[in-house]
Amino acid sequence: MLWKACRKEFNKPKYLAHSSDLIYKYRNEIAEKARFRLVDKENGDPLRVVEHIGCHYSKMFPSKGVGGAEYPYVLAGMAEAWGGNVIDYPERRHCCGYGFRQYHVKANRGYSIANTHKKFESMEPYKPDMIITNCPGCPYFLDRWQYVIAEMEGKTYGQNGFGIPVLTYEELAGLVLGYDPWDLG
């Protein structure tokens, strides 16, 4: 198919790693240098973290992802090393709603928000303090649709009425290391 489209071939490299695999590899070193841990400053309890693995992380090359395609551990491993309590929830592997066919085709946008709605309904009983992702598109859609759902249905997820914070693993690593949130972007 690639050859038909652009006369190019994809030669799978011998070594293949997602950038989140690299942070995972150094998660313990980051924990040693951490200025902050993923704990509630009021009571010292671990923060409740739900993870969202981007659809393309382990589905494209199932044997390459940390933990495999069925139960990827790359984000959970980071959150646990940094003091968090990773919460499993029924729709953990469900799409965030971004899929190119779901969002970029205007007629499919209802499907996009329905995906995200299903995911939030699934995680809500577990009262997560944050969501961590490893895809640049997922946090955008998890944030965007969370607030659209609030406007449409008057329902806000999260304990404080402001929604559940959504962070990428890079942002979370930076915060744990003590970087200023405004400098992280």
Pin down the residues of each PLM region:
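Iron-sulfur cluster-binding electron-transfer modules in prokaryotic oxidoreductases
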Residues: 1-185
